[in-house]
Amino acid sequence: MKKMKKMKNKKLKILLSAPRGFCAGVERAIEIVEKSIQKYGVPVYVRHEIVHNKYVVDDLKNKGAIFVEELEEIKDKSRPVIFSAHGVPKKIPEDAKNYNMTYVDATCPLVSKVHREAENLSKAGYHIVLIGHQNHPEVIGTMGQLPLSSIDLIQNEDEAKKYINKNNKKIAFVTQTTLSIDDTKNIIKILKEKFPDIKEPLKEDICYATTNRQMAVKNIAKNCDIFFIIGSRNSSNSVRLVEVAKKSGCKNALLLNSLSKIPYEKIANSNTIGISSGASAPEILVKNFINELKKRFTISIDEVETIKEDVVFKIPKKLN
């Protein structure tokens, strides 16, 4: 009790990064699941986690969604299935049609844009290089838009340096939407030096929300003794935010996915802490974290907004 009282006397400044949390693609995907439940009743099936956040997935499970990894797992094929925000290989909607299943595609429109780019460039005679992380569902979905012989994956600078254009075709690159901006720039620089004629997207593929959240974290990281990113371990954009905070001047940056894992001793040795959240993390998780801190410290909060966001994506007409 004395220790708690002593901590309560400790003053702590919170720099709250903005924008943070849900992006338009995530909000759209969650709304698609909720509207599908309203329209079709329960259960509705969702192929893969709709977004990479346990809180969101558990909430939708409670509302009547059942999550599977493959269509074969769905015993009652008369029930609708929703494809996650990360996108799916082209084969998946075809399989759903063969099963006579009703499906709703919750792929983020910005991921769908990358799919179209890859397809159009391939049709125009280009061999495609995808910059991204192997086994991430978005990467699996993008690579699945084309025959495997038409697309290669590059994950880092080392792979970019070693990459050989075996097809002797003209090449073009596209990227995963949730990458580190700075790391991706370095990979692109290497590819452009090796292949001066490489074709790039008309507009960069890293999405507005990824860019804005990384800029916002970068803006305040150097002023923080410790930085917390609220998000799940399998959330690519959340993990990238931790990396950005570390590279931008706050070596003590951590991913927090559970209130039971708050490192109070580390916080007690800090004066200023930064807080942001990944694009799939709901704001309630940030509020819950701050409320836990209020129980133990005397805190002041300064929200630092780097850029305003007003992007909204429409849901499919069939759900209106």
Segment roles from a protein language model:
Residues K2-I273, S277, E283-N320:
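The feature marks the mature, well-folded catalytic cores of soluble enzymes
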